[in-house]
Regions:
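Transmembrane-helix signature of 12-pass secondary carriers
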Residues: 2-447
């Protein structure tokens, strides 16, 4: 009997680290579930700009409410700090199995009201559901995918998020013919990608995170999950077997000496980038009108095309240059370009559009760092809370940009809006130049 126990112990010890396995069907299932969620999130965030531009034809909506409703989902995303803590406490799977259904229902509820305060509340709740995928989806993905594939696949998520975001712009631009209900129908189309993601997750249920289970002292359960999805020879790595169960993490630890710099960099780079990106992208129709470009619909499509090119370019650059160099150069170049547009008067419209498109390409290429970089800044003990905190800080930037852009454009035209964006981006350049740590395994080894 003792010999049999020794053999069993030996077999357990000989299990290979599941993070070193080749890509398997379970990895692709988790990745696809997160991809569909990213498409739904990008769509739900982007749809408000074109819907509100359409709404102004039928209802009285001032700059304040335009900014608030446009920023509503981004304000809701500030709940990422709560979602991150909740996922560190109860795990990743439960939240991801429910949030897309709730997102779909909330999107449909926008058909039932044109009351602006009610609509604002719904948009905030939509943002809270998006926060689940932003925070928990990324944590589950990085905890399941093989080492090396995790950060690479995370950087690819931005392609799918951008596809959802661009699809929302095209949907809002080309839906018409429903009279005074057109803008509500545009908003409600966010239910379609949300329910597609929800149904996929129900048909192909998401697994629990083995790393999270082991870090909470549930090593046997973690190994059972791995065995079920990957086979007998894979298991939890030794370092997680020996790790003490994680105690509840206090938010204050993120502002202690060990994590303070990482928390500030992760939150502030994200906030400055989001200020410019969401402010411009969500209210692109308003900005293009103020820029007095001849064909605003085509100009908008070109700008959005630049965004997609930028994300693809970012993915190509992602593992070829260091994270730190990527951040610094991205903020510097995008800040100079949008600043040049802001201070230059009477430029030919084609030159304006060309510079604006190059700006879109450069700024969007930096979005590729939004998922892997904050995740890499924190270890597994505080990852959910840390990433959630960074996303929360970033959403203040995103909400501020989205809230302020219609007001700034109305007060001082496109030039004022672009000048403020330039100042924020150049501030991010200085922050990253001074504080940003290198997190890329490839370039850390070379230093």
């Amino acid at each position: 009997m003792r010999k049999e126990r020794q053999n069993n112990t030996k077999n357990i010890k000989e299990k290979k680290n599941y993070k070193k396995a080749p890509l398997m069907p379970i990895h692709l299932r988790v990745f696809m579930a997160v991809v569909l969620g990213q498409i739904a999130c990008g769509f739900a965030l982007g749809i408000s700009g074109t819907a509100l531009s359409n709404a102004s034809k039928y209802i009285t909506i001032n700059d304040l409410w335009t900014g608030l409703i446009g920023a509503g989902s981004l304000i809701g995303l500030a709940g990422s700090i709560l979602i991150g803590r909740l996922s560190d406490k109860i795990g990743r799977r439960k939240l991801l199995m429910l949030n897309m259904y709730i997102l779909g229902i909330l999107s449909l509820m926008q058909l039932l009201t044109n009351n602006l305060p009610t609509l604002f509340i719904i948009r905030v709740l939509i943002g809270l559901m998006i926060a689940v995928d932003y925070t928990v989806g990324n944590a589950l993905l990085t905890e399941w995918l093989p080492k090396g594939e995790d950060s690479k696949k995370q950087s690819h998520l931005l392609i799918y998020w951008t596809i959802g975001f661009i699809a929302s712009y095209l949907t809002g631009t080309f839906i018409n013919g429903f009279g005074s209900h057109t803008w509500q129908i545009i908003l409600a189309t966010g239910a379609i990608p949300a329910f597609i993601a929800a149904i996929f997750r129900s048909i192909f249920p998401l697994p629990a995170s083995p790393s999270w289970l082991a870090s909470h002292g549930k090593v046997k359960t973690a190994n059972k999950v791995i065995k079920k999805h990957m086979g007998r020879k894979w298991g939890i790595p030794k370092r997680l077997k020996k790790a003490k169960p994680v105690k509840e993490v206090s938010w204050t630890i993120l502002f202690s000496g060990k994590y303070l710099r990482r928390t500030l960099v992760g939150g502030l780079f994200y906030a400055c980038q989001a200020f410019a990106f969401f402010g411009i992208s969500i209210f692109l129709p308003i900005l293009l009108q103020s820029m007095q470009l001849t064909d605003q619909k085509i100009s908008g499509i070109i700008y959005n095309g630049g965004m997609l090119i930028g994300v693809i370019l970012g993915i190509l650059l992602f593992n070829r240059i260091s994270r730190r160099a990527f951040l610094i150069s991205n903020f510097l170049l995008s800040g100079i370009l949008i600043g040049f547009l802001a201070i230059t008067k009477n430029l030919n419209s084609n030159i304006q559009l060309t510079i604006f498109c190059i700006f879109a390409i450069i700024l969007s290429s930096g979005l590729v760092l939004d998922y892997p970089y904050p995740t890499e800044l924190f270890d597994i003990k505080v990852r959910g809370t840390g990433v959630g905190t960074c996303i929360t800080i970033s959403r203040f930037g995103a909400a501020a940009g989205t809230f302020l852009l219609p007001i700034l454009t109305n007060q001082g035209g496109a030039s004022l809006s672009m000048l403020i964006c330039a100042i924020v981006l150049l501030a991010a350049f200085i922050i990253c130049l001074i504080w940003a740590p290198e997190t890329s395994p490839k370039f850390k080894q070379n230093n």
